[in-house]
Amino acid sequence: KCDCSFRAGAPGFVQVLDEKTRAYPEYRGNGVLARVGNLLENPHIGMIFLDYYQTTVGLHVNGNARVLDPHEAAALPNLPAGMTEAAHSQGGRRPQAWILIGVEEAYIHCSKHVPLLTRQDKHITWGTDDERLKGGNFFKVTPAPPRS
């Protein structure tokens, strides 16, 4: 059993610390940091990086994850210059944790069936708990609260 959670960010939000180690910031999304809890229970992690806009090639990365608080992440050896500072500039948000990945395997994902997409503007309201903006009940599985 493994967690599967979507993550996206500006180019470089997943940092290469060395040949076998990656790190990325974990922000408050749904308010409960579910991904962090899931990784603490089961540290196996699988990631796929897809280039939808130019080559449509992907990269699979599988390994084990450790959850670090921001101070632990800042003390890592081989930290790329500005890594933690750059993470703070993403929409004015600060990471709640960092995920450190020990890479066990990585391989290319063929571009044959990956669609080529075009970029569209999308307004994002960071840090909101408004269900309409988050889309948290998109499939209507949670009963609507009674109207007053």
Where are these regions (language model features)?
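Binding-site signature for planar aromatic cofactors or substrates
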Residues: 1-148
